[in-house]
Amino acid sequence: YSEEDLIEIIEFAKSINFEFASYMSASKFYKDYALKTNDKSKYLEDYNQHVAIVALYLADGNKEQAKQFILAMIEQRYQPATPTFLNAGRARRGELVSCFLLEVDDSLNSINFIDSTAKQLSKIGGGVAINLSKLRARGEAIKGIKGVAKGVLPVAKALEGGFSYADQLGQRPGAGAVYLNIFHYDVEEFLDTKKVNADEDLRLSTISTGLIVPSKFFDLAKEGKDFYMFAPHTVKQEYGVTLDDIDIEKYYDELVANPNVLKKKKDAREMLNMIAQTQLQSGYPYLMFKDNANKVHANSNIGQIK
């Protein structure tokens, strides 16, 4: 852009009348989005100026396109995602994308790597969801010694602390979610972390939780049957495939019948009630319907959604 272009675009943005719809919306903008001095004692821009800077960045040198973006944002016809609206056009900024998906393998090296990666992504303003379904369950064996695995909860707690610590320069808090397959042995403990009366040492108070739910679970609930939760490490030992990657529709009955696979059972409808009660108390867990997502997966040739 030339200097004349910049002046013209800024004046165009200032000429459009904008009023916040509520005190809450004005407070949200000036608290979380407006550029401030380093000591945060003064604001350096108003809403129209902020929109102009975002539009200039997105238009990438196209003056008329920048004006169209400004008009669309001020008229509330278009709203960029939070990281884009916060960071576009700034020299000292995070990334412009919203979400990152990670997966933990069943090893301490992987746990440490994902913990570090999640902090780095949180630092640049990303929301991070992490699949914990490959981790061995509480009480499983490590190097043949039974009863020593700690399960998924300590990992979830460590990640929660990381997201609280690594925010975006105090401008935007870290946001993370941990997901677990509903057939995982630790799923009941995982649900308990969001109950209002959960022990503070176990409660996940700031990180979000979600369940990955294959259609097989709903089939069992519909038929009024028990469903089994399996210890992932014993599944991997028997079949060479992780619980998260195995075709549960195909192998479920075989897993139930295999005496070498550690498992426990619960009425499927009771589990649905448990999920509903936890959601009523906390709003969690999120539910990801795995098979439905994969039926309409546009990039199924690359791999499955899990």
Describe the role of every protein-language-model region.
Residues Y1-K306:
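Extended catalytic cores of very large enzyme megasubunits
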